[in-house]
Amino acid sequence: MSKEKFERTKPHVNVGTIGHVDHGKTTLTAAITTVLAKTYGGAARAFDQIDNAPEEKARGITINTSHVEYDTPTRHYAHVDCPGHADYVKNMITGAAQMDGAILVVAATDGPMPQTREHILLGRQVGVPYIIVFLNKCDMVDDEELLELVEMEVRELLSQYDFPGDDTPIVRGSALKALEGDAEWEAKILELAGFLDSYIPEPERAIDKPFLLPIEDVFSISGRGTVVTGRVERGIIKVGEEVEIVGIKETQKSTCTGVEMFRKLLDEGRAGENVGVLLRGIKREEIERGQVLAKPGTIKPHTKFESEVYILSKDEGGRHTPFFKGYRPQFYFRTTDVTGTIELPEGVEMVMPGDNIKMVVTLIHPIAMDDGLRFAIREGGRTVGAGVVAKVLS
Protein backbone atom coordinates (compact mmCIF):
# COMPACT_ATOMS: atom_id res chain seq x y z
CA MET A 1 0.00 0.00 0.00
CA SER A 2 2.85 2.38 0.83
CA LYS A 3 3.87 2.45 -2.86
CA GLU A 4 0.53 3.98 -3.90
CA LYS A 5 1.03 6.78 -1.41
CA PHE A 6 4.51 7.45 -2.77
CA GLU A 7 3.21 7.79 -6.36
CA ARG A 8 1.03 10.70 -5.41
CA THR A 9 3.92 12.75 -4.14
CA LYS A 10 5.51 12.93 -7.59
CA PRO A 11 5.26 16.24 -9.42
CA HIS A 12 2.36 16.26 -11.88
CA VAL A 13 3.03 17.61 -15.39
CA ASN A 14 0.55 18.13 -18.24
CA VAL A 15 1.73 17.39 -21.77
CA GLY A 16 0.26 16.54 -25.16
CA THR A 17 1.06 15.52 -28.71
CA ILE A 18 0.71 18.09 -31.50
CA GLY A 19 1.54 17.98 -35.21
CA HIS A 20 0.24 17.29 -38.72
CA VAL A 21 -2.50 14.74 -39.44
CA ASP A 22 -1.17 11.17 -39.94
CA HIS A 23 2.33 11.98 -38.72
CA GLY A 24 1.83 9.50 -35.87
CA LYS A 25 0.65 11.47 -32.81
CA THR A 26 -1.72 8.78 -31.56
CA THR A 27 0.70 5.94 -32.33
CA LEU A 28 3.36 7.79 -30.35
CA THR A 29 0.94 8.32 -27.45
CA ALA A 30 0.27 4.55 -27.39
CA ALA A 31 4.00 3.79 -27.67
CA ILE A 32 4.88 6.06 -24.72
CA THR A 33 2.30 4.41 -22.43
CA THR A 34 3.35 0.93 -23.57
CA VAL A 35 7.12 1.36 -23.28
CA LEU A 36 6.96 3.25 -19.96
CA ALA A 37 4.54 0.69 -18.50
CA LYS A 38 6.94 -2.09 -19.50
CA THR A 39 9.97 -0.24 -18.09
CA TYR A 40 8.64 1.53 -14.99
CA GLY A 41 5.21 0.00 -14.37
CA GLY A 42 1.79 1.53 -15.05
CA ALA A 43 -0.97 0.89 -17.58
CA ALA A 44 -0.37 0.54 -21.31
CA ARG A 45 -3.01 1.97 -23.63
CA ALA A 46 -3.68 0.51 -27.09
CA PHE A 47 -3.88 2.68 -30.20
CA ASP A 48 -7.61 2.09 -30.72
CA GLN A 49 -8.38 2.96 -27.08
CA ILE A 50 -6.74 6.34 -27.61
CA ASP A 51 -7.98 6.95 -31.13
CA ASN A 52 -11.59 6.48 -30.08
CA ALA A 53 -11.61 9.76 -28.18
CA PRO A 54 -14.66 10.61 -26.09
CA GLU A 55 -16.47 13.91 -26.59
CA GLU A 56 -16.24 16.47 -23.83
CA LYS A 57 -17.51 19.97 -23.41
CA ALA A 58 -15.33 22.96 -22.54
CA ARG A 59 -17.00 26.39 -22.44
CA GLY A 60 -19.92 25.05 -24.45
CA ILE A 61 -17.67 23.64 -27.16
CA THR A 62 -17.59 19.97 -28.05
CA ILE A 63 -14.04 18.63 -28.21
CA ASN A 64 -12.84 15.10 -28.82
CA THR A 65 -9.86 14.42 -26.59
CA SER A 66 -8.09 11.36 -25.23
CA HIS A 67 -6.41 11.56 -21.85
CA VAL A 68 -3.73 9.05 -20.88
CA GLU A 69 -1.42 8.94 -17.89
CA TYR A 70 2.06 7.57 -17.46
CA ASP A 71 4.98 7.70 -15.05
CA THR A 72 8.71 8.13 -15.24
CA PRO A 73 10.77 7.47 -12.10
CA THR A 74 10.56 11.14 -11.10
CA ARG A 75 7.22 12.40 -12.46
CA HIS A 76 3.60 11.67 -13.22
CA TYR A 77 2.34 12.82 -16.63
CA ALA A 78 -1.16 13.54 -17.86
CA HIS A 79 -1.07 13.46 -21.66
CA VAL A 80 -3.71 14.68 -24.09
CA ASP A 81 -4.10 13.55 -27.69
CA CYS A 82 -6.76 14.75 -30.14
CA PRO A 83 -8.00 12.84 -33.18
CA GLY A 84 -8.75 15.77 -35.47
CA HIS A 85 -7.09 19.07 -36.34
CA ALA A 86 -10.19 21.07 -35.34
CA ASP A 87 -10.07 19.40 -31.91
CA TYR A 88 -6.51 20.66 -31.39
CA VAL A 89 -7.48 24.19 -32.30
CA LYS A 90 -10.42 24.15 -29.88
CA ASN A 91 -8.44 22.42 -27.15
CA MET A 92 -5.56 24.86 -27.25
CA ILE A 93 -7.74 27.96 -27.45
CA THR A 94 -10.19 26.99 -24.69
CA GLY A 95 -7.38 25.73 -22.48
CA ALA A 96 -9.46 22.59 -21.87
CA ALA A 97 -6.16 20.76 -21.69
CA GLN A 98 -3.57 23.23 -20.49
CA MET A 99 -0.10 22.02 -21.49
CA ASP A 100 3.12 22.56 -19.55
CA GLY A 101 4.90 21.28 -22.64
CA ALA A 102 4.09 19.67 -25.97
CA ILE A 103 5.58 16.87 -28.05
CA LEU A 104 5.62 17.98 -31.69
CA VAL A 105 5.43 14.91 -33.93
CA VAL A 106 6.93 15.31 -37.41
CA ALA A 107 7.12 12.42 -39.88
CA ALA A 108 10.66 12.18 -41.26
CA THR A 109 9.10 10.94 -44.51
CA ASP A 110 7.21 14.23 -45.02
CA GLY A 111 9.00 16.89 -43.02
CA PRO A 112 7.06 19.89 -41.66
CA MET A 113 3.56 20.26 -43.18
CA PRO A 114 0.90 23.04 -42.94
CA GLN A 115 -0.57 21.83 -39.63
CA THR A 116 2.94 21.48 -38.19
CA ARG A 117 3.30 25.22 -38.67
CA GLU A 118 -0.22 25.95 -37.45
CA HIS A 119 0.23 23.96 -34.23
CA ILE A 120 3.54 25.70 -33.49
CA LEU A 121 1.88 29.09 -34.05
CA LEU A 122 -1.07 28.11 -31.84
CA GLY A 123 1.37 26.93 -29.20
CA ARG A 124 3.02 30.34 -29.26
CA GLN A 125 -0.31 32.22 -29.16
CA VAL A 126 -1.87 30.24 -26.32
CA GLY A 127 1.30 30.04 -24.23
CA VAL A 128 2.55 26.44 -24.52
CA PRO A 129 5.93 27.14 -22.90
CA TYR A 130 8.06 24.20 -24.12
CA ILE A 131 8.14 22.01 -27.23
CA ILE A 132 10.11 18.78 -27.69
CA VAL A 133 10.28 17.23 -31.18
CA PHE A 134 9.76 13.57 -32.00
CA LEU A 135 10.93 12.85 -35.54
CA ASN A 136 8.74 9.85 -36.38
CA LYS A 137 8.94 7.10 -39.03
CA CYS A 138 12.76 7.26 -39.08
CA ASP A 139 12.78 3.51 -39.78
CA MET A 140 11.51 4.39 -43.27
CA VAL A 141 14.30 6.84 -44.09
CA ASP A 142 17.76 5.43 -44.89
CA ASP A 143 19.33 8.72 -45.85
CA GLU A 144 21.11 10.41 -42.93
CA GLU A 145 21.33 13.69 -44.89
CA LEU A 146 17.57 13.73 -45.40
CA LEU A 147 17.02 13.34 -41.64
CA GLU A 148 19.41 16.22 -40.98
CA LEU A 149 17.57 18.36 -43.50
CA VAL A 150 14.17 17.68 -41.92
CA GLU A 151 15.65 18.39 -38.49
CA MET A 152 17.01 21.71 -39.73
CA GLU A 153 13.63 22.68 -41.23
CA VAL A 154 11.87 21.93 -37.95
CA ARG A 155 14.39 23.98 -35.97
CA GLU A 156 13.95 26.94 -38.35
CA LEU A 157 10.17 26.71 -38.06
CA LEU A 158 10.33 26.72 -34.24
CA SER A 159 12.68 29.72 -34.23
CA GLN A 160 10.33 31.57 -36.57
CA TYR A 161 7.66 31.45 -33.85
CA ASP A 162 10.05 32.42 -31.01
CA PHE A 163 10.72 28.94 -29.67
CA PRO A 164 14.44 28.18 -29.13
CA GLY A 165 14.81 26.09 -32.31
CA ASP A 166 18.56 25.56 -31.96
CA ASP A 167 18.27 24.20 -28.41
CA THR A 168 15.09 22.16 -28.81
CA PRO A 169 15.59 18.44 -28.12
CA ILE A 170 14.84 16.32 -31.21
CA VAL A 171 14.46 12.56 -30.85
CA ARG A 172 14.65 10.36 -33.95
CA GLY A 173 12.34 7.39 -33.59
CA SER A 174 9.64 5.11 -34.87
CA ALA A 175 6.49 5.03 -32.75
CA LEU A 176 5.12 2.00 -34.60
CA LYS A 177 8.32 -0.06 -34.21
CA ALA A 178 8.49 0.86 -30.52
CA LEU A 179 4.85 -0.16 -30.09
CA GLU A 180 5.67 -3.50 -31.73
CA GLY A 181 8.37 -4.07 -29.10
CA ASP A 182 11.52 -3.50 -31.15
CA ALA A 183 14.19 -2.78 -28.52
CA GLU A 184 16.22 -0.35 -30.66
CA TRP A 185 13.17 1.90 -31.11
CA GLU A 186 11.86 1.39 -27.56
CA ALA A 187 15.10 3.03 -26.42
CA LYS A 188 14.09 6.15 -28.38
CA ILE A 189 10.81 6.37 -26.44
CA LEU A 190 12.81 6.26 -23.19
CA GLU A 191 15.06 8.99 -24.60
CA LEU A 192 11.94 11.09 -25.28
CA ALA A 193 10.68 10.46 -21.73
CA GLY A 194 14.08 11.60 -20.44
CA PHE A 195 13.66 14.91 -22.27
CA LEU A 196 10.14 15.33 -20.84
CA ASP A 197 11.75 15.02 -17.40
CA SER A 198 14.73 17.28 -18.04
CA TYR A 199 13.57 19.88 -20.59
CA ILE A 200 10.13 20.78 -19.20
CA PRO A 201 10.60 22.45 -15.81
CA GLU A 202 8.32 21.57 -12.95
CA PRO A 203 5.23 23.77 -13.33
CA GLU A 204 4.55 26.36 -10.66
CA ARG A 205 1.51 25.28 -8.67
CA ALA A 206 -1.48 27.61 -8.45
CA ILE A 207 -0.99 27.96 -4.71
CA ASP A 208 2.56 29.33 -5.18
CA LYS A 209 1.46 32.12 -7.54
CA PRO A 210 0.39 35.60 -6.38
CA PHE A 211 -3.10 35.77 -4.86
CA LEU A 212 -6.06 36.35 -7.18
CA LEU A 213 -9.79 35.95 -6.59
CA PRO A 214 -12.41 36.74 -9.25
CA ILE A 215 -15.35 38.42 -7.48
CA GLU A 216 -18.66 36.61 -7.94
CA ASP A 217 -20.83 38.33 -5.35
CA VAL A 218 -20.77 41.26 -2.94
CA PHE A 219 -22.64 41.50 0.37
CA SER A 220 -22.82 44.04 3.09
CA ILE A 221 -22.88 42.63 6.62
CA SER A 222 -24.08 45.14 9.17
CA GLY A 223 -21.51 45.94 11.80
CA ARG A 224 -18.77 44.09 9.90
CA GLY A 225 -18.50 45.69 6.48
CA THR A 226 -18.38 44.42 2.92
CA VAL A 227 -17.77 40.80 1.97
CA VAL A 228 -16.87 39.57 -1.50
CA THR A 229 -17.20 35.91 -2.43
CA GLY A 230 -15.59 33.76 -5.09
CA ARG A 231 -13.19 30.91 -5.74
CA VAL A 232 -9.52 31.68 -5.14
CA GLU A 233 -7.90 31.22 -8.56
CA ARG A 234 -4.34 31.26 -7.30
CA GLY A 235 -2.21 31.98 -4.26
CA ILE A 236 -3.22 32.48 -0.63
CA ILE A 237 -4.98 35.37 1.13
CA LYS A 238 -4.25 35.84 4.83
CA VAL A 239 -6.15 37.98 7.31
CA GLY A 240 -4.42 41.37 7.65
CA GLU A 241 -2.95 41.41 4.12
CA GLU A 242 -3.40 44.28 1.69
CA VAL A 243 -5.30 43.62 -1.53
CA GLU A 244 -6.12 45.56 -4.67
CA ILE A 245 -9.52 45.59 -6.32
CA VAL A 246 -8.81 45.59 -10.06
CA GLY A 247 -10.92 46.02 -13.19
CA ILE A 248 -13.95 47.95 -14.49
CA LYS A 249 -13.31 51.00 -12.23
CA GLU A 250 -10.20 52.72 -10.88
CA THR A 251 -8.01 50.28 -8.91
CA GLN A 252 -8.63 50.57 -5.14
CA LYS A 253 -6.65 49.29 -2.16
CA SER A 254 -8.08 47.60 0.90
CA THR A 255 -7.14 45.21 3.69
CA CYS A 256 -8.55 41.73 4.25
CA THR A 257 -10.00 41.74 7.77
CA GLY A 258 -11.49 38.25 7.65
CA VAL A 259 -11.78 35.07 5.57
CA GLU A 260 -14.68 32.68 5.92
CA MET A 261 -15.68 29.38 4.38
CA PHE A 262 -18.94 27.52 5.11
CA ARG A 263 -19.71 30.14 7.80
CA LYS A 264 -16.47 29.35 9.62
CA LEU A 265 -13.77 31.95 10.17
CA LEU A 266 -10.35 31.07 8.82
CA ASP A 267 -6.86 32.58 8.96
CA GLU A 268 -6.43 32.23 5.20
CA GLY A 269 -8.06 31.24 1.92
CA ARG A 270 -6.13 29.10 -0.57
CA ALA A 271 -6.20 28.38 -4.31
CA GLY A 272 -9.23 26.27 -5.22
CA GLU A 273 -11.34 27.25 -2.19
CA ASN A 274 -14.65 29.11 -2.29
CA VAL A 275 -14.37 31.85 0.29
CA GLY A 276 -15.81 35.10 1.53
CA VAL A 277 -13.31 37.90 2.09
CA LEU A 278 -14.16 40.78 4.41
CA LEU A 279 -12.73 44.11 3.21
CA ARG A 280 -11.94 47.15 5.34
CA GLY A 281 -13.30 50.56 4.35
CA ILE A 282 -15.02 49.50 1.12
CA LYS A 283 -18.69 50.30 0.54
CA ARG A 284 -21.02 47.77 -1.04
CA GLU A 285 -21.57 50.01 -4.09
CA GLU A 286 -17.84 50.59 -4.73
CA ILE A 287 -17.19 47.01 -5.79
CA GLU A 288 -18.89 44.62 -8.23
CA ARG A 289 -18.88 41.20 -9.84
CA GLY A 290 -16.28 41.01 -12.61
CA GLN A 291 -13.55 42.77 -10.66
CA VAL A 292 -10.79 40.75 -9.02
CA LEU A 293 -9.09 40.88 -5.63
CA ALA A 294 -5.35 40.54 -6.08
CA LYS A 295 -2.03 40.88 -4.35
CA PRO A 296 -1.04 44.55 -4.91
CA GLY A 297 0.95 45.21 -8.07
CA THR A 298 0.54 41.73 -9.57
CA ILE A 299 -2.16 42.37 -12.18
CA LYS A 300 -3.26 45.43 -14.13
CA PRO A 301 -6.51 46.35 -15.87
CA HIS A 302 -6.43 46.43 -19.69
CA THR A 303 -8.85 47.18 -22.51
CA LYS A 304 -6.95 46.26 -25.68
CA PHE A 305 -5.36 42.94 -26.56
CA GLU A 306 -4.47 40.60 -29.37
CA SER A 307 -6.28 37.28 -29.18
CA GLU A 308 -6.61 33.91 -30.85
CA VAL A 309 -10.24 32.84 -31.08
CA TYR A 310 -12.33 29.91 -32.25
CA ILE A 311 -15.85 30.69 -33.51
CA LEU A 312 -18.37 27.92 -32.79
CA SER A 313 -19.94 26.17 -35.74
CA LYS A 314 -23.70 26.07 -36.22
CA ASP A 315 -23.73 22.42 -35.02
CA GLU A 316 -22.06 23.47 -31.78
CA GLY A 317 -24.86 25.95 -31.11
CA GLY A 318 -22.92 28.89 -32.51
CA ARG A 319 -23.89 31.49 -35.09
CA HIS A 320 -25.52 30.43 -38.34
CA THR A 321 -24.04 33.33 -40.29
CA PRO A 322 -20.63 34.97 -40.63
CA PHE A 323 -19.75 38.25 -38.91
CA PHE A 324 -17.86 41.23 -40.31
CA LYS A 325 -15.76 44.11 -39.02
CA GLY A 326 -17.84 46.28 -36.72
CA TYR A 327 -19.03 43.16 -34.85
CA ARG A 328 -19.66 44.06 -31.17
CA PRO A 329 -20.27 41.00 -29.01
CA GLN A 330 -19.71 40.54 -25.27
CA PHE A 331 -16.45 39.11 -24.01
CA TYR A 332 -16.91 36.99 -20.89
CA PHE A 333 -13.89 37.13 -18.57
CA ARG A 334 -13.96 34.99 -15.40
CA THR A 335 -17.28 36.18 -13.97
CA THR A 336 -18.62 38.95 -16.21
CA ASP A 337 -19.45 40.11 -19.73
CA VAL A 338 -17.87 43.24 -21.23
CA THR A 339 -18.80 44.61 -24.65
CA GLY A 340 -15.93 45.01 -27.09
CA THR A 341 -15.14 45.86 -30.69
CA ILE A 342 -12.90 43.79 -32.95
CA GLU A 343 -10.26 44.37 -35.61
CA LEU A 344 -9.76 41.52 -38.08
CA PRO A 345 -6.40 40.72 -39.69
CA GLU A 346 -5.55 42.51 -42.92
CA GLY A 347 -7.32 40.98 -45.90
CA VAL A 348 -9.96 39.21 -43.78
CA GLU A 349 -13.42 40.57 -44.55
CA MET A 350 -15.61 38.08 -42.70
CA VAL A 351 -15.39 35.26 -40.19
CA MET A 352 -17.41 32.07 -40.64
CA PRO A 353 -18.77 29.80 -37.90
CA GLY A 354 -16.13 27.08 -37.32
CA ASP A 355 -13.17 29.37 -38.14
CA ASN A 356 -10.23 30.13 -35.92
CA ILE A 357 -8.80 33.61 -36.28
CA LYS A 358 -6.48 36.16 -34.73
CA MET A 359 -8.24 39.39 -33.71
CA VAL A 360 -7.51 42.57 -31.80
CA VAL A 361 -10.20 43.35 -29.23
CA THR A 362 -10.94 46.69 -27.55
CA LEU A 363 -13.21 46.50 -24.49
CA ILE A 364 -15.45 49.33 -23.25
CA HIS A 365 -14.30 48.72 -19.62
CA PRO A 366 -10.87 47.57 -18.42
CA ILE A 367 -10.55 44.02 -17.09
CA ALA A 368 -7.74 42.56 -14.94
CA MET A 369 -5.77 40.45 -17.40
CA ASP A 370 -2.47 38.82 -18.29
CA ASP A 371 -1.39 37.00 -21.43
CA GLY A 372 -2.93 33.53 -21.46
CA LEU A 373 -6.28 34.52 -19.91
CA ARG A 374 -9.19 32.58 -21.46
CA PHE A 375 -12.53 34.16 -22.37
CA ALA A 376 -15.80 33.35 -24.11
CA ILE A 377 -17.46 35.42 -26.81
CA ARG A 378 -21.19 35.76 -26.20
CA GLU A 379 -24.26 37.28 -27.78
CA GLY A 380 -27.09 37.83 -25.35
CA GLY A 381 -25.85 35.16 -22.94
CA ARG A 382 -25.24 32.54 -25.65
CA THR A 383 -21.65 31.41 -26.25
CA VAL A 384 -20.59 31.88 -29.88
CA GLY A 385 -16.82 31.62 -29.49
CA ALA A 386 -13.84 31.00 -27.24
CA GLY A 387 -10.57 32.85 -27.09
CA VAL A 388 -7.32 33.43 -25.32
CA VAL A 389 -5.40 36.66 -24.72
CA ALA A 390 -2.24 36.21 -26.80
CA LYS A 391 -0.79 39.62 -26.02
CA VAL A 392 -1.97 42.55 -23.91
CA LEU A 393 -1.63 45.80 -25.90
CA SER A 394 -2.91 48.56 -23.60
Swiss-Prot record:
Belongs to the TRAFAC class translation factor GTPase superfamily. Classic translation factor GTPase family. EF-Tu/EF-1A subfamily. Residues 81-84 are annotated as: G3. The N-terminus is blocked. The keyword Transmembrane helix does not apply. GO terms for biological process: response to antibiotic; translational elongation. The modification Phosphothreonine is found at T383. It is an enzyme of class 3 (hydrolase). The keyword Ribonucleoprotein does not apply. Its EC number is 3.6.5.3. This is Elongation factor Tu 2. Residues 10-204 form the tr-type G domain. Changing F262A: Still associates with EF-Ts, very little Qbeta viral RNA polymerase complex forms. It comes from Escherichia coli (strain K12). The modification N6-methyllysine is found at K57. Mg(2+) binds at T26. GO terms for cellular component: cytoplasm; guanyl-nucleotide exchange factor complex; plasma membrane. Residues 136-139 are annotated as: G4. InterPro entries: EF-Tu_GTP-bd, EF-Tu_GTPase, EFTu-like_2, EFTU_2, G_TR_CS, P-loop_NTPase, Small_GTP-bd, T_Tr_GTP-bd_dom. GTP hydrolase that promotes the GTP-dependent binding of aminoacyl-tRNA to the A-site of ribosomes during protein biosynthesis. May play an important regulatory role in cell growth and in the bacterial response to nutrient deprivation.
